[in-house]
């Protein structure tokens, strides 16, 4: 489990948030069904360091300290939302979510596509409709990713939400018929198939005419 150290902060509006950012700190908040919002701040350098190793499904051990470096509390949280500056793309705010043990939570799990589809080798295109899969699960059963093998998919084949293999206790929140990935048929392939069908059908018509003339 990834550990992250944060400090308590007193919210004082946008000016204070800007001052924090100038000092290399990022304002954040911790909340949950049984947790009142806790304003905290975190060093940007520390956040950037761990940001590339965590996702929305990564449990984080959050160590909350006061200004005197005393540990106030420790919580197991998940990264709920990251806000970035529109121009610089620097992180400007973070939301941490603390679930309630024993109560199910909703979370988006990354979809991992593995294998090279048969249909792609025939000229088709792999289309992924959902990069993440919304699920409902217990906090201690959150999967890091949902893997789907597309090796056997041919032209026109589709994997629906109902086809996903999920761990025990994890429920997909997509409709059963929702398409997750598919192999699109390129127009060139469709046109060639139609031309072949027409060429095959033509001799049959000629043969029938010859039979009628013989009669």
Swiss-Prot record:
Matches recorded under InterPro entries: Rbsml_bL25/Gln-tRNA_synth_N, Ribosomal_bL25/Gln-tRNA_synth, Ribosomal_bL25_b-dom, Ribosomal_bL25_C, Ribosomal_bL25_long, Ribosomal_L25_dom, Ribosomal_uL5_bac-type
Region (Disordered): 192-215
Basic and acidic residues: compositionally biased ranges: 204-215
Name of a matching Pfam family: Ribosomal_TL5_C
GO BP annotations listed: translation
Protein purpose: This is one of the proteins that binds to the 5S RNA in the ribosome where it forms part of the central protuberance.
Quaternary state and interactors: Part of the 50S ribosomal subunit; part of the 5S rRNA/L5/L18/L25 subcomplex. Contacts the 5S rRNA. Binds to the 5S rRNA independently of L5 and L18.
Name of the protein in question: Large ribosomal subunit protein bL25
Record organism: Thermotoga neapolitana (strain ATCC 49049 / DSM 4359 / NBRC 107923 / NS-E)
